[in-house]
Amino acid sequence: MASQKPHLNLITIGHVDHGKSTLVGRLLFEHGEIPAHIIEEYRKEAEQKGKATFEFAWVMDRFKEERERGVTIDLAHRKFETDKYYFTLIDAPGHRDFVKNMITGTSQADAAILVISAREGEGVMEQTREHAFLARTLGVPQIVVAINKMDATEPPFSEKRFNEVKADAEKLLKTIGYKDATFVPISGYKGDNVTKPSPNMPWYKGPSLLQALDAFKVPEKPINKPLRVPVEDVYSITGIGTVPVGRVETGVLKPGDKVIFLPADKQGDVKSIEMHHEPLQQAEPGDNIGFNVRGIAKNDIKRGDVCGHLDSPPTVVRAFTAQIVVLNHPSVIAPGYKPVFHVHTAQVACKIDEIVRTLNPKDGTTLKDKPDFIKTGDIAIVKVIPDKPLVIEKVSEIPQLGRFAVRDMGQTVAAGQCIDLEKR
């Protein structure tokens, strides 16, 4: 049973042409849940077009076209299993989507595969550095490096070339703080060393890519952190009372607990908790729950409030300092700019009061102090003042409530995380 295995969110990162899609295709087709009839259709079509080798990249492109044409291939098919785990692949097509998904935590990745091409003239490139730095900054705890296109080295499957690329990648990962990455030579296109050892690389004695993925660790549930339940909705149920609904991000909630909702500043006692219409004696991180609170009326609290225990209440800020990445802004962002910040379930207009400094995306060192403005692609430290009280936490303390997206003009213009705060 798949659901009995621990589940990990896995993100594939790396330069756009280094073979991510091919590798993802290979994993999904060999171990995933793409229905056999779809594979068969592709196989026939590939043969007719003289692509009898059944090129995975081509299949992935078809996959993409079908999605674009609105023939949805359910996201459930982006899952694959190993002996030990059940993985969901968060494939990041574009650089911007990748950063946005990563930062907003809609898909907090538990681990990453960094794909680097071993082909001459490729190797560690600009985007490789940026993706790796962002993965680290945004809290992806563990990484496996897939040194891809080993079939395209000179000569093919060259141990010397593998060692060169590995040395560069190792240096990069050490500078940004990944201590113990595994480096695996593969060919996503030909399938070498993806699921089983390759006869073409007898010199390599390490794990296959799948074995390396199985060596990842399961993240621990943050049950020892203070309780935080961002409110998604509030219902008033006849005969029961006020029932807020939301997902437990950190900590543990039990019937009988004394809780406070902030910034609403309303207190109450938890009478009962339900998940999927079943009573719960204890709610833990990841649980989507409804809970009945005595002493609170439906209109006292709303979406965006956060529930915590009375003795360690959620943090309401007057201002905070954030590290942001500008993803997509048509002009420039200067002090005084006031977009909408999406933090957990809250949406609050916030003013960028000061641009403290910009950072080098490759290593996080300071580029410029107090610049006049920032633009798409920049990483900056900024001071932010919300229009009204807002709950946000330091990413170093409760990362689940420390990340946010910045929206304006119908798009995500930036994303970031809270690194310091001034309590209200």
UniProtKB/Swiss-Prot annotation:
Gene3D superfamilies tied to this protein: P-loop containing nucleotide triphosphate hydrolases, Translation factors
E.C. numbers: 3.6.5.3
Enzyme class: hydrolase
Pfam family, one: GTP-eEF1A_C
UniProt GO MF annotations: GTP binding; GTPase activity; translation elongation factor activity
Listed transmembrane segments: none
Residues bound to GTP: 14-21, 91-95, 148-151
Protein name per Swiss-Prot or TrEMBL: Elongation factor 1-alpha
Classification of source organism: Archaea, Methanobacteriati, Thermoplasmatota, Thermoplasmata, Thermoplasmatales
